[in-house]
């Protein structure tokens, strides 16, 4: 069984999980490309990586789907800096819809910053989190709120599961027919102290 690395050992390392699911490590985060390059040049991007990673993501898309690759939409698991870092640059190249849970809307429209982290949570990642950027961005002109049904626009066969805790509107993506789960950062919701 192929697994996406918990943290990126080598930034820029791509792993084909399935013919239509490819994950790319971008420093401490992962982005996923959904689409089978043997059948189409179109793809959906899950998350938008770290700041200054747009070039890497665009280059990987071209390598996988061809120079004329076409991004259909971006689905965000949540709006933390390591999942939206290249979002605005990607939208300059591809003016596409961005889908997120309604509870992430304030952080993606510039209305609110994420609250400060809880200092009482143990673990190295939790202790480092006050150093992470918490500021919001404004992509309101591209932002679309996911429907409450759990269905994912432009991704037939996939659904989203609201997995709050890491952020209020955190989602994970699931495809029933092959039991694929893209967890986002949901793994940090339980026993975070065991993470480092």
Q: Which residue stretches match the model-derived regions?
A:
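Metallo-beta-lactamase
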Residues: 2-5, 10-11, 104-161
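Conserved beta-strand hairpin/beta-sheet module of binuclear metal-dependent hydrolase folds
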Residues: 10-65, 172-184, 189
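Core dinuclear metal-dependent hydrolase active-site scaffold
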Residues: 33, 149-175
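Short catalytic-loop micro-motif centered on adjacent basic/acidic residues
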Residues: 44-47, 73-76, 160-162
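Active-site metal-binding loops of divalent metal-dependent hydrolases
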Residues: 48-50, 79, 102-104, 166-167, ...
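Active-site metal-binding motif and surrounding structural segment of the metallo-beta-lactamase
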Residues: 54-100, 104
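Short, intrinsically disordered, charge-balanced linker/junction segments flanking boundaries
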Residues: 146, 192-196
């Amino acid at each position: 069984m192929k697994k996406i690395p918990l943290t990126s050992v080598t930034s820029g390392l791509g792993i084909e999980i399935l013919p239509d699911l490819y994950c790319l490590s971008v420093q401490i985060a992962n982005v996923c490309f959904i689409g089978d390059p043997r059948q189409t040049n179109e793809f959906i991007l899950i998350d938008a990586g770290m700041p200054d990673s747009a070039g890497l993501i665009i280059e990987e898309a071209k390598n996988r789907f061809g120079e004329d690759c076409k991004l259909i939409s971006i689905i965000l698991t949540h709006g933390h800096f390591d999942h939206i870092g290249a979002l605005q640059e990607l939208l300059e190249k591809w003016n596409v819809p961005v889908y997120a849970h309604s509870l992430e809307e304030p952080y993606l429209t510039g209305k609110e910053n994420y609250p400060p982290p809880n200092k009482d949570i143990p673990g190295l990642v939790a202790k480092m989190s006050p150093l992470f950027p918490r500021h919001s961005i404004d992509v309101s002109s591209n932002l679309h709120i996911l429907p409450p049904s759990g269905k994912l626009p432009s991704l037939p066969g996939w659904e989203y599961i609201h997995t709050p805790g890491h952020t209020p509107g955190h989602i994970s993506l699931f495809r029933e027919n092959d039991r694929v789960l893209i967890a986002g950062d949901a793994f940090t919701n339980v026993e975070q102290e065991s993470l480092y």
